[in-house]
């Protein structure tokens, strides 16, 4: 009998009932709530005269709509947009009514849902974790079965603590070797997406393994699992190991005392068996990965920084040729244009992909002693949570950014998506550490280029894309 994958083990441990149609009822351990996808769910509970089944499994915070500028200290009334203000206010009211723990807008523990849950220890190995946000896959970095859900499913979880789901196939992404200096977890996952495409992981739970993955910090692993959704997979996973345990230990929601010892012992099995069989296997050599930059309107439209934008005339597939032509037109680029010739109007360092302390340190290392180029209209750094912000300030990172000409903001989703005041104007190019570069994602007509924090900082000081390895080598010389 073949061994089991990590996904198999997590699924079986939470399968309440298998149904005749092939679907299963899955128990949910942790439910994370934000202001955008929860109002209708709570209203559904009221209309059905129900209450949350297990209040203690829920944790909430506003993130999508909150302003990241100082005026937010004025409270909810400082949110200018009426819809945004109403959503944040409604979350507060719903959590207060049902006794759900919420880190409100000006609580130091507030931040992006996928940052605050891990840093609180609310995301633990072996859990099932859901949230009304597609990037819930982030939490798979802990060896947890985590994925996004829709608003109706948010209501189902609140009411029953279960979801109906169908088991997915297993995909293994093995990344072996040592990453070159200046190449990060963000570059790994962009390279994976560039290799398999945004549909490559469709219908799969995607486990990341190999020596390069094992060497990553938890922040790096979260970055990779965060963007498994952009690779087509609903679920991203990394096996639990000593790095995972060290990160979780001592956090507020983590087990304590004897329960901690028991938990750590049980987590040892949160790995795929050596003889486990995967439906699909993808392999990458970490030593060959270079800093990545997306050039088009899909995350799969990504290249190494030393490459050139594709020429649609060289593409034989008419559908692909049309996609390239449309992307070039929207992005305002020309065929065969060098990535390093793309000039930037704005730079955004933040989002649930890259706003943790390790990300800010990497960007600050590049920004230190340098200045944002005069041609760059705005460069902002948005910590993923109040706790990340406080840690960065203790380390003096805020001063490095401010002296270089970056804006230092309050935590929130910010410029990742055009649901708050931080957004692009039409035609502007932005080097962004976020996860999506669709048309209009950062604002109507905005042009998004996905990069790592170090690459974003390098672009800010150069005014155009530059190979960050040149700056690192220059600093070492």
UniProtKB/Swiss-Prot annotation:
Biological processes per GO annotation: L-leucine biosynthetic process
The protein's annotated pathway: Amino-acid biosynthesis; L-leucine biosynthesis; L-leucine from 3-methyl-2-oxobutanoate: step 2/4
Gene Ontology MF: a single term: metal ion binding
Metal-binding is among the record's keywords: yes
Domain of life, per lineage: Bacteria
Residues reported to bind [4Fe-4S] cluster: 352, 413, 416
EC number in record: 4.2.1.33
HAMAP family on file: LeuC_type1
Protein's job: Catalyzes the isomerization between 2-isopropylmalate and 3-isopropylmalate, via the formation of 2-isopropylmaleate.
Oligomer status and interactors: Heterodimer of LeuC and LeuD.
Protein name: 3-isopropylmalate dehydratase large subunit
Organism: Pseudomonas putida (strain GB-1)
Gene that this polypeptide is encoded by: leuC
